[in-house]
A protein has these predicted regions:
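Short, basic, low-complexity termini and linkers enriched in Ser/Thr/Gly/Pro
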Residues: 1-17, 184
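C-terminal SET catalytic tail plus cysteine-rich post-SET Zn-binding segment of SAM-dependent SET-domain
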Residues: 101-184
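Catalytic cores of histone-lysine modification enzymes
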Residues: 19-107
């Protein structure tokens, strides 16, 4: 994405409000066999390439509880009690990255909001991340990813598992890395 000089002077014009998140032009959104809509590779994507960047407003857990009632899940946790996502129905679509969960993901988080390809990805593959790399919450859900290594049940506490910490070393959200470091 090329940003004009006027956008640098006026950051509000850099990205239209309907596009709070970035999705690579090599990806498209369509119906997913996992759940709802998903993100899919429209062209081959190389390992390490940026696939999407989560955007939106930053808010605390209390605000999350308030907006989740009407907007459903649309946020990503970025710190102990902070999240990034939409605050209104008008922001929801533009803040989505449409990355469903998989126990064998092909994209992973770098830092807090940037998602990169974990391996070379072929056209047509759904672009998924393991929610254990971004979430610290109390939820529990049945997993429908279909991977041979599927955990069957995914929880907001899966980041605590040593096997997943090892598997996703370098691709855990910053705040989870800090929590793990403090516990060591």
């Amino acid at each position: 994405m090329r940003i004009s000089k006027s956008a640098i002077r006026n950051p509000q014009s850099a990205i239209p409000m309907s596009k709070l998140s970035y999705i690579s032009p090599k990806a498209i959104v369509k119906e997913s066999p996992i759940q709802g809509r998903g993100l899919f590779a429209a062209k081959p994507i190389q390992k390490g390439e940026i696939v999407c960047i989560k955007g939106g407003s930053i808010f605390n857990r209390q605000t999350l509880q308030e907006v989740s009632e009407t907007l459903g899940p649309a946020e990503i946790q970025i710190a102990e009690d902070f999240f990034i996502g939409p605050l209104s129905e008008q922001e929801r679509e533009g803040s989505m990255i449409f990355s469903n969960h998989s126990c064998e993901p092909n994209i992973g988080v770098q830092g807090q909001i940037v998602f990169v390809a974990l391996r070379d990805i072929e056209t047509g593959e759904e672009l998924t991340h393991d929610w254990a790399t971004t979430d610290d919450d109390t939820y529990e859900m049945e997993c429908k990813c279909g991977a041979s290594t599927c955990r069957k049940v995914v929880t907001g506490q899966d980041w605590r598992r040593k096997d997943l910490q090892d598997k996703y070393a370098g691709h855990l959200s910053w705040y989870l890395v800090e929590k793990i470091r403090r516990k060591s």
